[in-house]
Protein backbone atom coordinates (compact mmCIF):
# COMPACT_ATOMS: atom_id res chain seq x y z
CA UNK A 1 0.00 0.00 0.00
CA UNK A 2 1.44 3.37 -1.03
CA UNK A 3 0.97 6.42 1.16
CA UNK A 4 1.90 10.01 0.44
CA UNK A 5 2.12 12.82 2.93
CA UNK A 6 -0.16 15.56 1.60
CA UNK A 7 -0.63 18.26 4.22
CA UNK A 8 1.07 19.43 7.43
CA UNK A 9 -0.96 21.82 9.62
CA UNK A 10 1.12 24.48 11.37
CA UNK A 11 -0.19 26.50 14.31
CA UNK A 12 -0.04 30.27 13.90
CA UNK A 13 -1.10 33.29 15.92
CA UNK A 14 -1.21 35.63 12.90
CA UNK A 15 -2.28 34.15 9.56
CA UNK A 16 -1.32 37.16 7.44
CA UNK A 17 2.15 37.39 9.00
CA UNK A 18 2.71 33.65 8.47
CA UNK A 19 1.39 33.77 4.91
CA UNK A 20 3.83 36.60 4.12
CA UNK A 21 6.72 34.70 5.74
CA UNK A 22 6.08 31.52 3.76
CA UNK A 23 5.08 33.11 0.43
CA UNK A 24 7.50 36.03 0.27
CA UNK A 25 10.31 34.86 2.55
CA UNK A 26 10.40 31.14 1.80
CA UNK A 27 9.04 31.25 -1.76
CA UNK A 28 6.15 28.84 -1.10
CA UNK A 29 3.26 28.90 -3.60
CA UNK A 30 -0.11 30.03 -2.18
CA UNK A 31 -2.51 27.29 -3.31
CA UNK A 32 -5.60 28.45 -1.43
CA UNK A 33 -6.65 31.30 0.85
CA UNK A 34 -10.31 30.71 1.63
CA UNK A 35 -12.83 31.51 4.32
CA UNK A 36 -15.29 28.58 4.27
CA UNK A 37 -17.49 30.04 7.02
CA UNK A 38 -17.92 29.89 10.78
CA UNK A 39 -14.98 32.29 11.20
CA UNK A 40 -12.52 29.86 9.64
CA UNK A 41 -9.73 30.82 7.26
CA UNK A 42 -7.59 28.22 5.51
CA UNK A 43 -4.33 29.09 3.74
CA UNK A 44 -2.51 26.25 1.97
CA UNK A 45 1.04 26.79 0.73
CA UNK A 46 3.42 24.45 -1.07
CA UNK A 47 7.23 24.57 -1.18
CA UNK A 48 8.56 24.80 -4.75
CA UNK A 49 9.02 21.30 -6.17
CA UNK A 50 7.14 19.58 -3.34
CA UNK A 51 3.97 17.51 -3.46
CA UNK A 52 3.36 18.09 0.27
CA UNK A 53 1.86 21.37 1.50
CA UNK A 54 1.48 23.20 4.77
CA UNK A 55 -1.76 24.73 5.98
CA UNK A 56 -2.20 27.67 8.35
CA UNK A 57 -5.37 29.40 9.35
CA UNK A 58 -7.96 30.54 11.83
CA UNK A 59 -10.19 28.04 13.60
CA UNK A 60 -7.96 25.10 12.79
CA UNK A 61 -5.96 24.67 16.01
CA UNK A 62 -6.01 25.94 19.57
CA UNK A 63 -4.04 29.18 20.08
CA UNK A 64 -1.77 27.38 22.55
CA UNK A 65 -1.20 24.33 20.31
CA UNK A 66 2.35 22.98 20.43
CA UNK A 67 4.64 24.19 17.68
CA UNK A 68 5.84 21.82 14.99
CA UNK A 69 9.55 21.11 15.27
CA UNK A 70 12.24 20.23 12.75
CA UNK A 71 10.37 19.84 9.47
CA UNK A 72 12.92 19.09 6.74
CA UNK A 73 13.19 20.72 3.33
CA UNK A 74 15.65 18.85 1.11
CA UNK A 75 17.59 21.14 -1.23
CA UNK A 76 20.19 20.47 -3.93
CA UNK A 77 22.49 23.34 -2.90
CA UNK A 78 22.21 24.39 0.73
CA UNK A 79 24.51 27.42 0.38
CA UNK A 80 22.39 28.77 -2.48
CA UNK A 81 19.14 28.07 -0.60
CA UNK A 82 20.50 29.73 2.56
CA UNK A 83 21.61 32.77 0.54
CA UNK A 84 18.23 33.14 -1.21
CA UNK A 85 16.32 32.88 2.07
CA UNK A 86 18.66 35.30 3.84
CA UNK A 87 18.25 37.85 1.05
CA UNK A 88 14.47 37.49 1.45
CA UNK A 89 14.79 38.40 5.15
CA UNK A 90 14.64 34.90 6.67
CA UNK A 91 17.09 34.27 9.52
CA UNK A 92 18.93 31.04 8.73
CA UNK A 93 21.66 29.44 10.84
CA UNK A 94 25.11 28.81 9.43
CA UNK A 95 25.46 25.56 7.49
CA UNK A 96 26.64 22.56 9.49
CA UNK A 97 28.28 19.55 7.84
CA UNK A 98 27.22 16.39 9.67
CA UNK A 99 29.39 13.80 7.95
CA UNK A 100 28.50 14.75 4.39
CA UNK A 101 24.87 15.68 5.06
CA UNK A 102 24.55 19.44 5.48
CA UNK A 103 21.96 21.31 7.55
CA UNK A 104 20.85 24.87 8.21
CA UNK A 105 18.02 25.76 10.56
CA UNK A 106 15.33 28.43 10.70
CA UNK A 107 12.03 29.15 12.40
CA UNK A 108 8.85 30.90 11.36
CA UNK A 109 7.38 33.85 13.31
CA UNK A 110 5.42 31.44 15.55
CA UNK A 111 8.35 29.21 16.48
CA UNK A 112 7.67 26.31 14.11
CA UNK A 113 11.15 25.11 13.17
CA UNK A 114 12.60 23.91 9.89
CA UNK A 115 15.83 22.31 8.70
CA UNK A 116 17.26 22.77 5.25
CA UNK A 117 18.99 19.51 4.35
CA UNK A 118 21.44 18.77 1.56
CA UNK A 119 22.01 15.05 1.18
CA UNK A 120 25.50 13.64 0.72
CA UNK A 121 26.64 13.66 -2.89
Model-based region annotation:
Residues 48-52, 62-64, 77-80:
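Short, charged/polar surface micro-motifs in flexible loops or helix N-caps
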